[in-house]
Each structure stands twice: as C-alpha cells, then as structure tokens.
Regions:
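Alpha-helical transmembrane segments and their helix-helix packing motifs
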Residues: 1-140
Length: 140
C-alpha cells in the first residue's frame, strides 16, 4: 500500500510531465502560427496568444514586457522563475521522483533522471525559432 506522501509525489510527477508536454504543444502552435505571418515583426499577436493560452500573462509581463519569439520561448522553456516553464516542470518531476525513488522501478527512475540530464545539455541555439522544433519534439 502506498503512503499518501508517495502517492502525492507520484501524482505530481505525472502531472508535471503532462504540463511540460502541454507547454511544448502550445509553443509549437505559436511557432507555426508566427511562421505564417510574412513579417516576423508583425507576429507578436501569435506570441501573445501563446502566453495567454499558457496562463502566464502576469509572470511574463513582470519579466519581459512585449511578447517576441525569443522572450516567449525563453519564458515558456527555460525561465525557472515561471513554474509552468518546461525546465521548471522537468525539475519538479525529478524532485518528486527523487523523493519516492524507492517506490519507482529502476526503469522509471532511469527515464526521469535521463530526461533531466539530457535537458541540461541543451544549448542556446536550441532556444531559437529555428532550433525550437527539435526541443519541442523531444519534450512531446
């Protein structure tokens, strides 16, 4: 029988994996929509919609101001001050997995830990409009 703390950590581990995937899908849609606009400087409404759909308007406004491709990508992928960013979600997944490591199979722990290690190897060029699809496909 699982202790409530163990069950809680496992639930949130799965929930944050799901949240990271949802943010990746939102970013992919925003990227595709912005690519349909002939002038990249006119694509701010697509990126604004992405921030709104992610529910991050307040945290985004505090740190970035006007939505552009680069600052929306930064906020939703690697800004750890944003609890809904992909990096923050992956960190929380790993933290919850570490808390209940003895209750996880070795395969699950290896997958979670490997996911975290691989995400730490991403480079700055992975967080551009051109490099983003590879990262988003990996997350999804």
């Amino acid at each position: 029988m699982l202790l409530s703390r163990t069950a809680d950590s496992m639930y949130w581990m799965a929930r944050y994996i799901e949240r990271a995937e949802s943010v990746a899908r939102l970013l992919d849609v925003g990227r595709r929509m912005s690519s349909l606009v002939p002038d990249p400087d006119d694509a701010s409404s697509e990126w604004t919609s992405t921030i709104e759909a992610a529910g991050c308007e307040a945290s985004f406004a505090e740190t970035h101001g006007t939505p552009t491709a680069s600052n929306v990508i930064d906020h939703l992928v690697r800004d750890v001050r944003n609890p809904s960013s992909i990096f923050a979600c992956l960190a929380t997944v790993r933290q919850n997995a570490r808390a209940v490591r003895t209750a996880l199979s070795q395969d699950v722990w290896d997958a979670v830990n490997g996911m975290w290690i691989e995400s730490q190897e991403w480079r700055d060029e992975d967080f551009t409009v051109e490099g983003l699809p590879r990262v988003l496909d990996w997350v999804k």
